[in-house]
Swiss-Prot record:
The lineage of its organism: Bacteria, Bacillati, Bacillota, Bacilli, Bacillales. The chain crosses the membrane at residues 636-656. GO terms for cellular component: plasma membrane. Signal peptide: none annotated. The keyword Transmembrane applies. Residues 588-622 are annotated as: Disordered. It comes from the Bacteria. This is Putative membrane protein Bcell_0381. The keyword Membrane applies.
């Protein structure tokens, strides 16, 4: 038999390896049969390219002809998709589209540009909510990336060109800005804002828009201001004309022009009427300010006069008048200082006294006075600097003054000045010593006699061998006066016992208007320097006058003191000094100087003198140097000496008492 083999056709499984694609179910297929191509699998970002018999995808499976012969696996072949990425720049510059495989990233293109905007990146959606990250995001389909933009903000700065500050502003591109408040600049007017430094293109805040950071430049015009001149209380002429000057330009201050003001001097201009501002002199320069300026004329008083001048001692001569500059004042010797009270007519002036500052209406500090002439200068300086000076010659009188003598032949005359300087009861000394020793006459004018008489002054004529002290109260003030002082020779033929004189012999006379004055109401003092004659006791010397009628010497008296014999007399004659013992006792002395009859005591003196003469004859035989015996004659001599001393003391007492009365 034939056994017949029974065959069962094999059924094979065909599996599908989708290689990442969607699942494809396996199918069973008989041997040598065809299989139906399954629905293509899907794989994101890929395109299906068919089934392949090998993993290397080199041998495609053709479902039309290929049959199944075994269990097999078909492998899906895929081709990665390439997508187009387009760029929507939203008004920016164009960006070319790019091709990119699925799952790949793309290189970020050069950022687009858009005027007035800043590029913020690419976004996957039109609403710009999801940014595209070129580092991590991958392409999965054809797509459009959308540019995102931010509008720019720009800073607008303002260049003030010296004006007040204006803050910069921020503004979006394409927007207008609000015009700021106009700046200020001293002395200038604001003309507007310009886009360029040269101020050629103005900025219009209504229409011009911001497109970048920018600076607007202020333009200014310089202002002009008036300078006005005010005469400020002037009373004549005209002020300079008003002028206009640009701010900060140099201004030259005008002069006085024809302005005038009585009693004042123009001293310049000031920015304040009362002179409290800035002061300018004509010709000064200054920079013009930022407002009109008025300059006020400034006037300084030229009054440098006093309204009153008061002195603490004496009287001004003449009476004070403001326009008279020179005055004289006499004060006594006891006044050692004075004060002056000057009162200014204008209190804006200043006053100084002998270069020491003083105050108007106030007593000055004490001004010391020297003996004689003291010149005090009172300087007034007016407000305008002009000056005026008052001179006050203060004569501080002296108690003892030497006369200024002028010799003419045998006589001298005197200058008035020294007499003016003499104080009340002062002594004017007429010095006739030395070269003037031979002068025999001193002449006084009527005016000088009057001055000396009014002052109750004394004149002392000084010779080398005689002092004569004469009170001028004795004389009439309306007559001139001559004093004759003539030294006599020691001629015994003219004057008995002249050779025995212990002093010079002088003839003294006083004449007024040619009339000899014989007797004086107030005694005149004589002082003789005496010489020592042998062993004569100087204290016993006496002054005598010569009586020409009897040709004899008559006693005046006297007191010895320090080399001088002093005596007083009420008349002038010829005078000399003798020791009583050196005159003849035979009536040589017969009466006192007043011609009074001798008293009983005087007669006793005569007796003593006669006895003394007899005794002297006897004593001549006694050798010199031998002590005389104490006889009755000597007793009388001592008695006589005592009487003489008593009389001399009485004379001194009378002399000083009379002198004190005269001074009182």
């Amino acid at each position: 038999m034939t056994l017949y083999a029974k065959w069962e056709i094999n059924v094979y499984t065909v599996s599908f390896a989708t290689n990442g694609g969607s699942k494809v179910s396996e199918v069973d297929a008989e041997f040598a049969s065809l299989i139906e191509e399954p629905t293509p699998p899907e794989k994101e970002g890929h395109s299906f390219k068919g089934w392949y018999q090998d993993e290397l995808l080199t041998e495609a499976w053709d479902f039309e002809v290929e049959t199944i012969t075994e269990n097999i696996t078909l492998y899906a072949k895929w081709e990665i998709n390439v997508y187009t990425v387009s760029f929507e720049s939203n008004g920016g510059s164009q960006v070319s589209e790019v091709e990119a495989e699925y799952g790949s990233s793309i290189t970020e293109p050069v950022p687009p540009e858009k005027e007035g905007h800043s590029f913020l990146g690419w976004y996957q959606d039109e609403l710009l909510t999801e940014a595209w990250d070129f580092e991590t995001s991958t392409v999965s389909e054809d797509m459009i990336l959308y540019a995102k933009w931010e509008i720019n903000e720009y800073t607008v700065s303002f260049e003030l060109n010296g004006g007040s500050h204006v803050s910069e502003v921020e503004a979006e591109y394409g927007s207008t800005i609000t015009e700021p408040a106009p700046p200020e600049k001293e002395g200038h007017s604001f003309l507007g804002w310009y886009q360029d430094e040269l101020h050629t293109e103005a900025w219009d805040f209504e229409t011009d828009v911001i497109s970048e950071n920018m600076t607007l430049y202020a333009q200014w015009s310089i202002n002009n201001y008036d300078v006005h001149y005010d005469g400020n209380d002037y009373d004549s002429g005209e002020a300079p004309l008003t002028e206009a000057f640009a701010y900060d330009s140099e201004v030259t201050v005008a002069g006085q022009h024809t302005l005038g003001r009585n009693g004042y001097t123009f001293i310049g201009w000031n920015t304040e009427r009362d002179g409290s501002g800035d002061q300018f002199e004509p010709g000064d320069t200054y920079r013009m300010g930022s407002e009109p300026l008025t300059l006020y004329a400034q006037w300084a008083s030229n009054n440098a006069k006093l309204s009153e001048l008061v002195i603490s001692h004496g009287t001004l001569t003449p009476i004070f008048e403001a326009d008279y500059a020179h005055y004289a004042v006499e004060v006594g010797h006891q006044v050692t200082s004075i004060t002056i009270t000057p009162t200014l007519q204008d209190t804006r002036s200043t006053v100084s006294i002998s270069q020491n500052e003083a105050a108007s209406g106030e007593v000055s500090s004490a001004i010391p006075l020297e003996e004689g002439l003291n010149t005090i200068i009172i300087d007034i300086t007016a407000e305008d600097g002009s000056t005026y000076a008052y001179t006050v010659d203060v004569m501080r009188k002296v108690t003892d003054q030497f006369a200024q003598l002028t010799r003419e032949s045998h006589f001298v005359t005197l200058d008035d000045e020294q007499i003016h300087m003499l104080d009340e009861e002062g002594t004017l000394r007429v010095d006739l010593q030395g070269e003037l020793d031979d002068v025999t006459e001193v002449k006084f004018t009527q005016y000088q006699v009057q001055l000396l008489q009014e002052k109750g002054a004394f004149v002392q004529v000084v010779k080398e061998d005689l002092l004569v002290y004469i009170p001028f109260i004795n004389f009439e003030p309306v007559k001139d006066l001559n004093i004759t002082i003539q030294r006599q020779d020691y001629n015994i033929d003219t004057f008995a016992f002249a050779d025995r004189s212990a002093s010079a012999i002088y003839q003294l006379n006083i004449d007024q208007n040619g009339e000899r004055i014989s007797v004086f109401e107030h005694d005149i003092q004589l002082s003789f320097p005496v010489k020592n004659i042998g062993e004569t006791n100087l204290e016993e010397l006496q002054v005598y006058y010569f009586n020409p009628d009897g040709q004899e010497w008559e006693l005046i008296g006297g007191t010895y003191n320090n080399g001088y014999i002093h005596a007083t007399t009420s008349h002038f004659s010829t005078f000399a000094v003798f020791h009583p013992d050196h005159l003849s006792v035979e009536d040589d002395v017969t009466q006192d100087e007043n011609g009074e009859e001798k008293s009983e005591e005087d007669n006793k003196e005569e007796i003593v003198e006669e006895n003394t003469e007899e005794d002297n004859k006897e004593e001549k035989t006694i050798e010199a140097g031998e002590e005389l015996p104490l006889t009755a004659t000597r007793t009388y001599q001592f008695l006589l000496a005592g009487i003489i001393m008593l009389v001399g003391g009485s004379c001194i007492y009378v002399f000083y008492r009379r002198r004190n009365i005269m001074k009182t």
